[in-house]
Amino acid sequence: MSERIIMDEAAIQRTVTRMAHEILEYNKGTENLVLLGIKTRGEFLAIRIQDKINQIEQKIVPTGTIDITHFRDDIEIANKQITQDAIEIDADINDKVVIIIDDVLYTGRTVRASLDAILLHSRPIKIGLAALVDRGHRELPIRADFVGKNIPTSKEESVLVYLNEKDSQNAVIIE
């Protein structure tokens, strides 16, 4: 199977910078802003966006992670134990503008699961969505507010995001 590099390290850096600016513009600054990255690569992207926002505004935005394991609808988990542990952040997200961050937006099911996790225990003012890659093929009425790159794909193709923090390289590849 052939693979195509869609984004290299420099393209990812530029995209993260642009997305940070878009999030700041959307929120009119950093007030009440919280970033939540969906494990695993979304959490690394959230930290990168947090760093960019800090460089731009000289303010550290509260940033955490969402583990959607117990909220997925495509696997059966014995004795589903839904706890607040799905969200890890050192800040209250009630009455905040929460931006969910993920690497690839595809069917929308991961985002639905993250919404379930957030809304189970909190009530944000507003929830937005940022995705490094939007590949289409939605199964749910979900769209990203901030998109790094729209990449039309077939359902047979895979979009792979590699980030230094996990994969020792930065690239977005289609195979």
UniProtKB/Swiss-Prot annotation:
GO terms for molecular function: RNA binding; uracil phosphoribosyltransferase activity. Keywords: Glycosyltransferase, RNA-binding, Transcription, Transcription regulation, Transcription termination, Transferase. It is an enzyme of class 2 (transferase). It catalyses: UMP + diphosphate = 5-phospho-alpha-D-ribose 1-diphosphate + uracil. Pfam families: Pribosyltran. Its EC number is 2.4.2.9. A motif (PRPP-binding) lies at residues 98-110. GO terms for biological process: DNA-templated transcription termination. Homodimer and homohexamer; in equilibrium. Regulates transcriptional attenuation of the pyrimidine nucleotide (pyr) operon by binding in a uridine-dependent manner to specific sites on pyr mRNA. This disrupts an antiterminator hairpin in the RNA and favors formation of a downstream transcription terminator, leading to a reduced expression of downstream genes. Also displays a weak uracil phosphoribosyltransferase activity which is not physiologically significant. NCBIfam families: PRK05205.1-2, PRK05205.1-4, PRK05205.1-5. This is Bifunctional protein PyrR.
